[in-house]
A protein has these predicted regions:
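Preference for long, amphipathic alpha-helical scaffolds in soluble/luminal domains
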Residues: 4-268
Length: 268
């Protein structure tokens, strides 16, 4: 009886040691793969000039100290000056990188797309408050799901960064986080929507909802030029939006922390 007990105990110890040792053995390889992917993605992203992607690069500069993106706001302002038709909305979103950003009359009237109606009120909630309709907009967006869900997550981040009170019960965000994670699923496909869901969950401090399997898939489908395609099931060139999302995701995976600098630029 005693001999059997000792054998069982030894087996348990071996199993426990294996569970601890295997991740420790794998971690260096994972770390190297992460660093290589991030380095290539940064090199690719230095050539990005899409203004909205430049704002995300600015977040990476402030949050992770990626000096390659130190001039992202200056590049954004250059693009803004060269795109008069897009200038009103570009001025609106410029506040991501400049807390004291100044709007011109009529700029907010250009906010019409559904995802912008979710995010922009949060971006300016400390200045303008929330309209009486905003809680209903969030509720309807939660019901509709799809790509609206990650933008509710983004709005929650910006509301917190601005020190505003979330206009819906906090319990409602559990549904949003859960359903956003469900967008990623277990399909081997890596596409723009799944990258957006994963990146925004990490930005919101909900990265534990994103599986390691998905991270491995993201690493596996990176293109040779350092970017990511809109969808991994379509042979196509790298696309800036998908690449910026993937890079944001991988930087959070590489640099886990209990808290980060805010996504929105703080007051000067």
């Amino acid at each position: 009886m005693k001999k059997t007990y000792i054998i069982v105990l030894c087996v348990i110890i071996v199993v426990i040691v294996s569970l601890i040792a295997v991740p420790l053995l794998l971690r260096p390889g994972r770390s190297e793969a992460l660093q290589n992917a991030i380095t290539k993605a940064i090199d690719y992203s230095e050539a990005i000039r899409d203004p909205y992607e430049l704002l995300m690069l600015n977040v990476m500069y402030r949050r992770f100290g990626i000096t390659a993106f130190a001039d992202s706001l200056q590049l954004y302002d250059q693009e803004l000056s060269e795109r008069p038709d897009d200038a009103p909305l570009l001025r609106v979103f410029r506040r991501i990188a400049d807390h004291d950003n100044q709007l011109q009359p009529g700029d907010l009237d250009e906010v019409s797309v559904d995802i912008d109606q979710i995010t922009v009120p949060a971006l300016y909630c400390d200045r303008l408050g929330f309209s009486d309709r905003y809680a209903d907009i969030l509720e309807q967006a939660t019901f509709m799901g799809g790509n609206l869900l990650p933008h509710i997550v983004l709005a929650r981040i910006w509301t917190k960064d601005n020190g505003c009170e979330w206009p819906r019960p906090e319990s409602s965000m559990e549904t949003v986080y859960s359903e956003t994670a469900d967008l990623i699923g277990y399909d081997p496909l890596v596409d723009d929507l799944r990258l957006e869901a994963a990146a925004f969950l990490f930005l919101a401090g909900q990265g534990s909802r994103v599986s390691d399997t998905f991270i491995d898939r993201v690493l596996a489908v990176q293109n040779d030029d350092g970017g990511w395609s809109y969808s991994s099931n379509i042979s196509s060139e790298s696309e800036s939006h998908a690449t910026v999302l993937a890079l944001m995701l991988l930087l959070h995976v590489q640099n886990p922390a209990d808290s980060y600098p805010p996504m929105l630029a703080p007051a000067s």
